[in-house]
C-alpha cells in the first residue's frame, strides 16, 4: 500500500521528482518520452506530465514499451489536448494506484481513482496499485460451492459459483440493470458483502441512469454514504483507449481489497467486457503491434487472462464476477466473445420474449447454463428438479406452434397437463424484486434455495394442478402462491 502518486502533483515526493523526462513525440493518446541514461522507468509505471511554468496538466500516462535510446512509449489515461514536445514528465516510480477500503462505497471514480461525483475527496490514505499478480495456487479456495442469490430462476436452473464468473447476455430494456441492482442488494443482505461496478466503455447516459436508479432504490444511501453497498468506477466511451483498457483493473483492485483485507464476499460487475478487449485492440494498434485474427491484438488471450485470473476465491473471501458480454454481429466465434467464454462458469441469458410477457426477471430458463448444475455439486434433488423443470418448459415450447394453429383442445390429455404445469412454472420463475418496490409497489422477496426446490417439486408433482396460473405470478415461495390462490377464489 502507498500514497497514490497519481491524484495530484503535490503528492509526488521530492525524491521522485528527480527522475524527469521530456516528451519527444505525441501520436494521439500515445507519448514517447526520453529519460536520462540509467533512469528508465519500469513497464506499467505511472508518468505525470508537468505543464509549462509548473502548471499542472493532470495527464497521467502508463509506460507500455521501452524503445531503446533511453526512450519509453506510454499510453495516456486522459485527453492529450494541449500537450507539447519538450514538456517535463515525472516518473512516479510506481504503477497507477487507487483508493481502496470502505470509504470507496457510494462514490464514483475514474480510472485513476479520482472521485468524479462532486462529493469531495475520498477519506482514505490506503491505496493499492492496479497491477498485481493473481493469487498463488496455494491461496485459492478450491471447494465448489453455490453462491445463493435469492433469485429463484438463477439458483435453480443456472446457479452461480462462489468466486465464479458469469456472463450476462441481454439487449436494451429487458431488465439487465434491475437484475444487477437486485444482486447488489441481495449480496449485501444475505452475505454481508459489498459490490463494485466497473463501467467499461459504456455510454455516459447509462452510467448516470444506473447511479440515479441506485440512489432511488437505496443501494446507494444518499443520507449516509458509507452505508452504501456499492462502489462505482467508470471509464466511458468518450475516454481514450488507455482509460477504457485500465478501468476494469481499477474496479478489480477495489474488489480485491474487500476480499483480501476485509475478508468479505464481493460481487464485481463489468459492463461491458467486450469494450475492455476493444480498448486493448486500439492501444495495440497505436503501439505498432502486428494485428492478429479479425484485427484484434496478438496479446488478446494474455490480457483477458491477466484480468480474469485475479477474479477468484481465496481462503479469505471471494470475488464473484458478473460480466455483460456484447457479441459483435451475433457471431459467437468472434475472438472477443470466444476468449471470454473460456473463462465463464455460467451464462444468464435475458429474453425479450419473456420481458414482453411481463415475466421478470426475464431470464431465459432454457438458454441459461451453468457448469455448477451437476448432481455431485448441487445434489441429486436439486439436479433432478432443475432437469424436470427444463423438460417441461422444453415440451411446452415444442407444443406452442400446434397450440397457435389448432388450440389447446387438440392436444392429448398428457400434453394439456404439461402445458398447464409449464405455464405455472413460467409464472413461478418470476419474482418481485426489492429494488423494484419503488416502481411496482409490491414488496421484494428473497427465496432460499431449499424453498425454491420445494416449490417447483410441488408444481411438478401435480399437487397444485387445481390452482389458477395467475396465483404463481410475482410471488416469493410456494406458500405465497397457495395463499394468493385462496384470495383469488374469494
Curated annotation (Swiss-Prot):
Its EC number is 7.1.2.2. It is found in: Plastid, Chloroplast thylakoid membrane. The keyword NADP does not apply. It catalyses: ATP + H2O + 4 H(+)(in) = ADP + phosphate + 5 H(+)(out). InterPro entries: AAA+_ATPase, ATP-synt_VA_C, ATP_synth_F1_bsu, ATPase_a/bsu_AS, ATPase_alpha/beta_chains, ATPase_F1/V1/A1_a/bsu_N, ATPase_F1/V1/A1_a/bsu_N_sf, ATPase_F1/V1/A1_a/bsu_nucl-bd. Pfam families: ATP-synt_ab, ATP-synt_ab_N, ATP-synt_VA_C. CDD domains: ATP-synt_F1_beta_C, ATP-synt_F1_beta_N, F1-ATPase_beta_CD. SMART domains: AAA. It is a peripheral membrane protein. GO terms for molecular function: ATP binding; ATP hydrolysis activity; proton-transporting ATP synthase activity, rotational mechanism. GO terms for biological process: proton motive force-driven mitochondrial ATP synthesis. SUPFAM superfamilies: C-terminal domain of alpha and beta subunits of F1 ATP synthase, N-terminal domain of alpha and beta subunits of F1 ATP synthase, P-loop containing nucleoside triphosphate hydrolases. ATP binds at residues 170-177. Keywords: ATP synthesis, ATP-binding, CF(1), Chloroplast, Hydrogen ion transport, Ion transport, Membrane, Nucleotide-binding, Plastid, Thylakoid, Translocase, Transport. GO terms for cellular component: chloroplast thylakoid membrane; mitochondrion; proton-transporting ATP synthase complex. It comes from the Eukaryota. F-type ATPases have 2 components, CF(1) - the catalytic core - and CF(0) - the membrane proton channel. CF(1) has five subunits: alpha(3), beta(3), gamma(1), delta(1), epsilon(1). CF(0) has four main subunits: a(1), b(1), b'(1) and c(9-12). Produces ATP from ADP in the presence of a proton gradient across the membrane. The catalytic sites are hosted primarily by the beta subunits. Belongs to the ATPase alpha/beta chains family. This is ATP synthase subunit beta, chloroplastic. The gene is atpB.
